[in-house]
């Protein structure tokens, strides 16, 4: 991989969370999203976790290989009794993708890797410790992607909300969002953007997803099926963007250095932008 290439990430762009204790939602979540995250952590009350593990593993035992390749299991934080229970029950199923909640260090990733050596780990950095160790976490060989989470992050530092009343992120959340993206890129891994909690605010979700695309996030997580299409639309170039990118790349074939195109000066970074837009257009 060229060091300037974005990390490959086969699961995006819309990753949909689904409570692991709601088997009635599993099929619909998988059908409507690019990948489904079966959540054993925050979406399941402590008293319900044992049942959730049971119904989730029943589901995992019956899905085909294609569905399995698009299924992520979010497990509880390393070093907890719930983590131990999660990995014990999952040992017989060997999920392809595991999301580790509240990842604090590369050793947390290693704790997953020891038990699931073939799994790709999506490390969820959603605490002050995880954010501070983002580069170390991203650098672990088993880490396929890192994701950030806003609300648990703010809780971990004593705050009360991740956003201002107008819906924009507070500076600390914006800082961590950028830090996660930079750590992922520096280590050649994919970055996944946090969820947008206001299900009714489609315009806000669309704007945030568009910013995720423009900034370099490989995917964005979501919590409701209605959020999938706005995320997909944000990652899909418009007809005008695709036409410009293809025309620019065609023109570049006739030049060996910087050149003018449609009133602008074009150099290598702008060609890389065009290549990525063309790739997203092809992925459709």
Residue ranges and their predicted role:
Residues 1-284:
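Expand to "…catalyze enediolate/carbanion chemistry for C-C bond making/breaking, isomerization
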């Amino acid at each position: 991989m060229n060091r300037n290439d974005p990390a490959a990430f086969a699961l995006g762009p819309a990753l949909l969370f689904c409570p692991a204790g709601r088997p009635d939602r599993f099929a619909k979540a998988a059908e409507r999203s690019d990948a489904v995250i079966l959540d054993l952590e925050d979406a399941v009350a402590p008293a319900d976790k044992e049942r959730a593990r049971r119904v989730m593993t029943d589901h995992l035992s019956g899905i085909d290989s294609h569905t399995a390749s698009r299924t992520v299991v979010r497990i509880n934080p390393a070093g907890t009794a719930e983590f131990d229970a999660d990995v014990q029950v999952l040992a017989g199923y060997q999920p392809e993708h595991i999301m580790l909640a509240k990842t604090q260090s590369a050793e947390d990733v290693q704790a997953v890797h020891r038990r699931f050596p073939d799994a790709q780990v999506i490390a969820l950095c959603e605490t002050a410790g995880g954010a501070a160790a983002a580069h170390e976490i991203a650098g672990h060989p088993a880490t396929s992607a890192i994701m950030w989470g806003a609300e648990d992050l703010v809780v971990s530092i004593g705050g009360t909300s991740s956003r201002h009343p107008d819906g924009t992120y507070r500076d600390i959340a914006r800082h961590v969002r950028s830090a996660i993206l930079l750590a992922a890129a520096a280590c050649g891994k994919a970055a996944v953007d946090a969820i947008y909690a206001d299900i009714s605010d489609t315009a806000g979700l669309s704007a945030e997803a568009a910013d995720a695309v423009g900034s370099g996030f490989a995917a964005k997580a979501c919590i409701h099926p209605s959020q999938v299409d706005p995320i997909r639309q944000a990652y899909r170039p418009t007809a005008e963007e695709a036409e410009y990118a293809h025309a620019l790349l065609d023109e570049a074939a006739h030049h060996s250095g910087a050149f003018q195109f449609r009133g602008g000066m074009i150099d290598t970074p702008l060609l890389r932008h065009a290549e990525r837009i063309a790739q997203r257009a092809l992925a459709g």
